[in-house]
């Protein structure tokens, strides 16, 4: 099968919509999915999101990050414009870096039920320290659970320089 029919995309309402509303408060309900046309194949989908912002829950100061989201889909896939708007909704959300990454991962698991997913935030330094939280998930009782354990054990083994933001 090649291409998609309009009926296949009936739940995709934000893509191509010229009346997009940008939400400034955390809004997981904005996320949309579409069907994976290749559910019998393992493959990664990776999003590079270089303009993520949130607020420090204590000081209210802005935090900036590039977020990397990689997943192996099952039946559903997240639509990219809805993901962009969802990430934008963190703009005025006060939470620690680690919490933001886990919230994003949990929302995407709830939305798509992927075989595997990982979310990595590379935050710009504030106060001379950068924080790069990484979280992952593999579907329990499957090879993806073992994959998650392996990737967690081997994650970020090599030191890096701060100029890779």
Swiss-Prot record:
Give the SUPFAM superfamilies listed for this entry.
Answer: Tetrahydrobiopterin biosynthesis enzymes-like (SSF55620)
What keywords would UniProt list here? Cytoplasm, NADP, Oxidoreductase, Queuosine biosynthesis
List GO molecular-function terms, semicolon-separated: preQ1 synthase activity
Sorted alphabetically, the Gene Ontology BP terms of this entry are:
queuosine biosynthetic process; tRNA modification
Q: Provide GO CC annotations from the record.
A: cytosol
The protein's matches in Pfam families, at most eight in alphabetical order, are given as: QueF
Compartments, record wording: Cytoplasm
What pathway does the annotation place this protein in? tRNA modification; tRNA-queuosine biosynthesis
Major location category of this protein: cytoplasm
| Primary enzyme class | oxidoreductase
Q: What is its EC number?
A: 1.7.1.13
Q: Where is the active site?
A: 56, 63
Reactions that this protein is recorded to catalyse: 7-aminomethyl-7-carbaguanine + 2 NADP(+) = 7-cyano-7-deazaguanine + 2 NADPH + 3 H(+)
Q: In which residues is substrate bound?
A: 78-80, 97-98
Function field: Catalyzes the NADPH-dependent reduction of 7-cyano-7-deazaguanine (preQ0) to 7-aminomethyl-7-deazaguanine (preQ1).
PANTHER family in the record: NADPH-DEPENDENT 7-CYANO-7-DEAZAGUANINE REDUCTASE
Question: Which family would the database say this protein is a member of?
Answer: Belongs to the GTP cyclohydrolase I family. QueF type 1 subfamily.
Q: Which NCBIfam families match?
A: QueF-II
Tell me the protein's name: NADPH-dependent 7-cyano-7-deazaguanine reductase
**Organism, scientific name:** Bacillus cereus (strain ATCC 14579 / DSM 31 / CCUG 7414 / JCM 2152 / NBRC 15305 / NCIMB 9373 / NCTC 2599 / NRRL B-3711)
Q: Which gene encodes it?
A: queF
């Amino acid at each position: 099968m090649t291409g998609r029919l309009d009926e296949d995309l009936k739940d995709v309402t934000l893509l191509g919509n010229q009346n997009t509303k940008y939400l400034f408060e955390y809004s997981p309900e904005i996320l949309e999915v579409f069907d994976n046309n290749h559910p019998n194949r393992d493959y990664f989908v990776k999003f590079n999101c270089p303009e993520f912002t949130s607020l420090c829950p204590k000081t209210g100061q802005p935090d900036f990050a590039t977020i990397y989201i990689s997943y192996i889909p099952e039946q559903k896939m997240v639509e990219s414009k809805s993901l962009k708007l969802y990430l934008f909704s963190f703009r005025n959300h006060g939470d620690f870096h680690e919490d933001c990454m886990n919230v994003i991962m949990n929302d995407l698991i709830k939305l798509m039920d992927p075989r595997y997913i990982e979310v990595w935030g590379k935050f710009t330094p504030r106060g001379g320290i950068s924080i790069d939280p990484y979280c992952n998930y593999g579907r329990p009782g499957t090879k993806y659970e073992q994959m998650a354990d392996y990737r967690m054990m081997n994650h970020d083994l090599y030191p890096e320089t701060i100029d890779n933001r």
